[in-house]
């Protein structure tokens, strides 16, 4: 995987181009996921994202796929600005922190309704982040005091199915675990959806012509 930071630069024109938009609560791990994939470095300090974009290139079947990865702000203050970054999205990554049940609930209660309103028909992948913290004793004990527990893989998978997501994946940006697989899946889903829509339009046009 070859990645390059975007500082206003455009993705190369050769090969396929895919726009990936990350959505989720502030602090859920989506920025770290993007930065580890695009730059190979985990950010040790948390700085709330406004809006960021990175370019990265994947090789799929020997051909380059250029990803435009948009990281959106999850804070309420940016509710009016966030929809400006949805147009032309090819795939949406709805992210949550597996150690934060509230961010998990917000995928179905907040983020799914928002993206389906602004991005009708765009495929969704649900991503559980920070899986390395599932076994953090201090964090788990703090959750137990509130009668809570980390979100399990099966709960994440079931929720993803309930919102009609095409896939559910988990990752740890800190450990670089499954990070590339998330974006590989995003690229494959986006390109598959694009091919499906192309042939559907061709079929519809043929039917209209007969």
UniProtKB/Swiss-Prot annotation:
UniProt subcellular location: Cell membrane; Early endosome
PROSITE patterns, per database record: RHO
Positions carrying Cysteine methyl ester: 207
Superkingdom of origin organism: Eukaryota
Signal peptide stretch: none
Presence of keyword Lipoprotein: yes
Propeptide, chain numbering: 208-210
Tissue: Widely expressed.
SMART domains: RAB, RAN, RAS, RHO
InterPro entries in the cross-refs: P-loop_NTPase, Small_GTP-bd, Small_GTPase, Small_GTPase_Rho
Main location: membrane
Biological process terms in GO annotation: actin filament bundle assembly; actin filament polymerization; cell projection assembly; fibroblast growth factor receptor signaling pathway; focal adhesion assembly; lamellipodium assembly; positive regulation of cell adhesion; positive regulation of cell migration
Keyword annotations: Cell membrane, Endosome, GTP-binding, Lipoprotein, Membrane, Methylation, Nucleotide-binding, Prenylation
Effector region (motif): residue ranges: 46-54
S-geranylgeranyl cysteine-type lipidated residues: 207
Record: residues binding GTP: 24-31, 71-75, 129-132
Function: Involved in endosome dynamics. May coordinate membrane transport with the function of the cytoskeleton. Involved in the internalization and trafficking of activated tyrosine kinase receptors such as PDGFRB. Participates in the reorganization of actin cytoskeleton; the function seems to involve WHAMM and includes regulation of filopodia formation and actin filament bundling. Can modulate the effect of DAPK3 in reorganization of actin cytoskeleton and focal adhesion dissolution.
The name this protein goes by in its record: Rho-related GTP-binding protein RhoD
Gene source species: Mus musculus (Mouse)
Source taxonomy: Eukaryota, Metazoa, Chordata, Craniata, Vertebrata
């Amino acid at each position: 995987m070859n990645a390059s930071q975007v500082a206003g630069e455009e993705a190369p024109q050769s090969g396929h181009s895919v726009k990936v938009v990350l959505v989720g609560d502030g602090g859920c791990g989506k920025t770290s996921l993007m930065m580890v994939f695009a730059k190979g470095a985990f950010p040790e300090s948390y700085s709330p994202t406004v809006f960021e974009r990175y370019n990265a290139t994947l090789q799929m079947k020997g051909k380059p796929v250029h990803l435009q990865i948009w990281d959106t702000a999850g804070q309420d203050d940016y509710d009016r600005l966030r929809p400006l970054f949805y147009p032309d999205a090819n795939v949406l990554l709805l992210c949550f922190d597996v150690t934060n049940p509230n961010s998990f609930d917000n995928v179905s209660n907040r983020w799914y309704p928002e993206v389906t309103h602004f991005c009708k028909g765009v495929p969704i992948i649900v991503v559980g982040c920070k899986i390395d913290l599932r076994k953090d004793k201090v964090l788990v004990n703090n959750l137990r005091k509130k009668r809570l527990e980390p979100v399990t893989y099966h709960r994440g998978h079931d929720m993803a199915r309930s919102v009609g997501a095409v896939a559910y994946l988990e990752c740890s940006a800190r450990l670089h675990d499954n990070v590339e697989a998330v974006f590989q899946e995003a690229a494959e889903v986006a390109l598959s959806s694009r091919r499906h829509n192309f042939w559907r339009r061709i079929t519809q046009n043929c039917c209209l012509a007969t």
